[in-house]
Amino acid sequence: MRSDSRLSRMLHVLLHMDRYQKPVTSEMIAGMLSTNPVVVRRTMAGLRDQGYVRSEKGHHGGWTLVKPLSEIALLDVYQAIGEPELFAIGPASDHPECLVEQAVNNAVGDTLREAEALILARLKAVTLGDLAGEFERRYAKLGASGPMPEICSD
């Protein structure tokens, strides 16, 4: 089963956009993510609708951040991309009248609800600014010299 990496990928994109400090085209983002610019525009539209990014058309156009990273929580991005399923597992519905299935579903459902609440609370507590700080600490630890990377590419 393939995992849904949209959240991680969009967090990655937003951090690069902050570093780049210029409009980033859908084509640039698509190249970074090895996907189609149409997919990028569709995903970025959710972020735009929530007021985290804006898009400018034209020769020097592209996507830019509207808010500072410190004001965007991971939960904000998760919600803006459509709140993808957190778990691939879930209750069964083959035999809803079966008391065994009901007991199993009750236990699994309760556990998943508790786990989801913990995950969402953590996503709410962490900002993109926190992630940027973690990146900068990791970069400094390398002892690297020269400019920091702006946009990933193949």
Protein language model regions, located:
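Extreme N-terminal segment that seeds HTH/winged-HTH DNA-binding domains in transcriptional regulators
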Residues: M1-L33
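Conserved segment of winged-helix/HTH DNA-binding domains
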Residues: L69-D94, L112-R113
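C-terminal regulatory/oligomerization modules of transcriptional regulators
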Residues: P96-D154
